[in-house]
């Protein structure tokens, strides 16, 4: 099964039922891929979803993720520090490397630097491209 890492903004935009990216959330729920997360990522998901939507929905979304059998939980023991423009984004990179994820799904421009780093290789897909693979 595919293992992917999803950045927080992509999680946020895929949740509404009218979102063109809702297919990404639905694909996770039916087991089309495994969502790979770390403690740091879960904390960020909860924080940002609470601020942007509301705390109750944030708790429900995170609880759904954590209780899913399609979850890959990892504790990255090494911090690669590959993204320097927004060091908070490194939590997603470290998770992807530690679990051997197929890709990070992100629309964040800070992740583009990863294309120029040969090792460790980390593939990044924007959410539209990833959504097209979920059909």
PLM region spans:
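Metal-dependent nucleic-acid phosphoesterase active-site entry motif
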Residues: 1-19
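A secondary-structure boundary/capping signal
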Residues: 7-8, 37-38, 107, 126
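Conserved glycosyltransferase catalytic-site signature
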Residues: 8, 86-90
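Acidic catalytic patch
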Residues: 62-83
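Acidic, PIN/NYN-like endoribonuclease modules and their adjacent C-terminal/linker elements
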Residues: 82, 90, 102-103, 109-135
């Amino acid at each position: 099964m595919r293992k992917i890492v999803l950045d927080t903004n992509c999680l946020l935009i895929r949740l509404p039922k009218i979102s063109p990216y809702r297919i990404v959330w639905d694909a996770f729920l039916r087991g089309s891929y495994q969502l790979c997360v770390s403690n740091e990522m879960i904390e960020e998901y909860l924080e940002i979803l609470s601020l942007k939507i509301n705390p109750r929905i944030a708790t429900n979304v995170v609880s759904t993720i954590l209780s899913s059998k399609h979850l890959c939980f990892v504790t990255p023991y090494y911090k690669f520090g590959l993204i320097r423009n927004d060091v908070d984004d490194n939590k997603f990179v470290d998770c992807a490397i530690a679990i051997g994820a197929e890709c990070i799904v992100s629309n964040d421009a800070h992740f583009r630097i990863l294309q120029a780093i040969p090792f460790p290789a980390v593939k990044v897909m924007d959410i539209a491209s990833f959504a097209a693979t979920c059909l």
